[in-house]
Amino acid sequence: MAEISAKLVQELRQKTGAGMMDCKKALKETEGDVEQAIDWLRKKGIASAGKKSDRIAAEGLVDTYIQPGGKVGVLIEVNCQTDFVARNDAFKTLVKNLAQQAATADSVESLLAQPYIEDANLTVDEAIKQTIANLGENIQVRRFINFALTDKTGVVDSYIHTGGRVGVLVELNSQSEAGAANEEVQNLARNAAMQVAACPNVEYVSVDQIPAEVVQREKDVESGKEDIANKPENIREKIVQGRIEKRLKELTLVDQPYIRDQSISVEDLVKQVKAKAGEEVEVSRFVRYILGEGIEKQESNFAEEVAAQMGVK
């Protein structure tokens, strides 16, 4: 078996919050497979399913753009190297412009090739390089996604939390344009985005959207937990089923207590809005970006990075 590197142990620690020795043992037991090691730690009760890394190294901003009319929306993440630059007005303006331009782009590469919105003589890539030269830091468009209601009726809305560190884009579908324009429906879209931002473990709208392989993985983890190993099989099955149902609800938006009224669920809220709008309304999809999620900050010379992106040797 290959030797378990310190980097691999650190990655597992960041993903699970487990101790160094537990992570090393888990990786040895799973031959260095991080995802299997996470499940091994969960079966041992050492790691929880909902642990998120709190060691995010990248700076920058997550921002959104909603086209007038609410039919097109963008969620974008642009990274820089320090919080100082992230709070700079020139950087903020750049990010807002990039969010707007990403509405008509299908990839980062195509976005970079567009004429820049503030100066058509420049491409977006050239505008970014000018900002790099002015601010002295590397700047990169990490990712973006756009939602467009081309063949459906409804509304797209967004929410930005903690000054651009968390962003959510939501699409809500209705039966008619009148329904989409309903104030209650539009408020639901914004409140759903806010709910997703407040619930970091939520990954799906409803249980029926959860892939079969995710359900099976949860079943395998729960079935392998040591605290039920000695119980009769029929009791084990009931415990496992109850735990799976609870876990799957933790992953779904509609099963969460509504943040503005904990006495009802998001599903209850949607039903209330349906009744007021007089037609079917549903949250169809969402995306959440957390600034720097999954990025490891490299130890490097910042001046050399800037020069490399500027094409200077």
UniProtKB/Swiss-Prot annotation:
InterPro entries: EF-Ts_dimer_sf, Transl_elong_EFTs/EF1B, Transl_elong_EFTs/EF1B_dimer, Transl_elong_Ts_CS, UBA-like_sf. PROSITE patterns: EF_TS_1, EF_TS_2. GO terms for molecular function: translation elongation factor activity. Residues 82-85 are annotated as: Involved in Mg(2+) ion dislocation from EF-Tu. It is found in: Cytoplasm. It comes from the Bacteria. Keywords: Cytoplasm, Elongation factor, Protein biosynthesis. It holds the Pfam family EF_TS. One of its GO terms (cellular component) is cytoplasm. Belongs to the EF-Ts family. Associates with the EF-Tu.GDP complex and induces the exchange of GDP to GTP. It remains bound to the aminoacyl-tRNA.EF-Tu.GTP complex up to the GTP hydrolysis stage on the ribosome. This is Elongation factor Ts. It comes from Nostoc sp. (strain PCC 7120 / SAG 25.82 / UTEX 2576). The gene is tsf.
